[in-house]
Every structure is written in structure tokens, then in C-alpha cells.
């Protein structure tokens, strides 16, 4: 199985879309202080994906047949099903297959993301090839993988 391990912020959700969820939430009626983010409807919960980034992502997925594994911190704010619904809303041709696990360890975001990817790969031996697309520089942690 081919896998694309995908971050969101800085990859498919570019800086010009950051905060778009707040506008959507306001239009929806506003998030109450007592509400967790998971209680906000999926279509209002996340920032918008960039249309050009989605086009490129769809081309890569179609050309390679890769499955998506989400490494983004967005995994903290919804289920795999929620993320699949959001991918549909954003026009992504495939729903995510899985999330990388959350590593209970201290360290930089780059280290933790690298360890999460490594743990996911260790638990999924059927992966024949993979790539991680992330705006974090994880080159210092290639020894993890």
C-alpha cells in the first residue's frame, strides 16, 4: 500500500485560510464557551483547504493510488469519520484512511511528529512506499524513521 502522510496547516490549509473556521463559526451562530471544538458541526470546525493545494493533492492521489494518513494536529478535533466528511466538503478525492497516533512524550513538534509517523509505520507493515508532506522541518529526526 502506498501512503501519503499529510499535515494540514501550511500544506493544504495555507496561511490565507487560517482563521476561516472562526468566520464560519460566527456565521453558524457562534461557538459557545462551554462547547468543545468536537461539538461544532464539521463544516464549521476547521479552516478551509486551499483550492490549488486540493487540486495538486487530488492529482497526486489519483496518479499514485496512495491512501491518506493524517498527521496534522487537526486529528485532535474530530474523528476519522468527521475528517472524511470534511475532506468531501473540501473536494478531496479520497477520505483519510487513518490518523497517526498521539505520542505521549515531551519534545519539539518536529520530534513528536516524526515519532508519530514512525509508530504508525511500525504498526502498518503493509506499507510498500510512503511520503510525508509537512511544513515542519523534520530532517533532524530522520534517524527516527
List each model region and its residues:
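Short, charged/polar micro-motifs that form catalytic or ligand-binding hotspots
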Residues: 43-47, 73, 107
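C-terminal cap/substrate-recognition subdomain and adjoining C-terminal extension
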Residues: 81-145
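Active-site neighborhood of HAD-like aspartate-dependent phosphohydrolases
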Residues: 1-63
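Substrate-recognition element of Asp-dependent hydrolases with the DxDx(T/V) motif
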Residues: 64-83
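Short His-Asn-centered micro-motif
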Residues: 6, 71-77, 133-135
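Short, solvent-exposed loop/turn segments at secondary-structure junctions
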Residues: 11-12, 19, 75-77, 136-139
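Short coil/turn segments at beta-strand junctions that form active-site/ligand-binding loops
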Residues: 1-2, 64-66, 126-129
Amino acid at each position: 500500500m502506498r501512503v501519503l502522510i499529510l499535515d494540514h496547516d501550511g500544506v493544504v490549509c495555507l496561511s490565507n485560510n487560517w482563521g476561516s473556521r472562526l468566520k464560519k463559526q460566527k456565521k453558524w451562530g457562534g461557538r459557545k464557551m462551554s462547547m468543545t471544538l468536537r461539538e461544532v458541526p464539521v463544516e464549521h470546525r476547521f479552516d478551509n483547504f486551499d483550492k490549488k493545494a486540493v487540486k495538486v493533492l487530488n492529482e497526486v492521489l489519483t496518479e499514485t493510488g496512495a491512501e491518506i494518513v493524517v498527521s496534522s494536529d487537526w486529528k485532535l478535533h474530530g474523528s476519522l469519520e468527521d475528517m472524511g466528511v470534511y475532506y468531501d466538503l473540501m473536494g478531496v478525492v479520497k477520505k483519510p484512511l487513518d490518523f497517526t497516533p498521539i505520542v505521549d512524550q515531551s519534545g519539539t513538534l518536529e520530534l513528536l511528529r516524526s515519532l508519530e509517523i514512525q509508530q504508525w509505520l511500525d504498526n502498518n507493515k503493509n506499507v510498500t512506499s510512503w511520503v510525508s508532506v509537512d511544513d515542519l522541518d523534520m530532517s533532524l529526526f530522520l534517524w527516527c524513521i
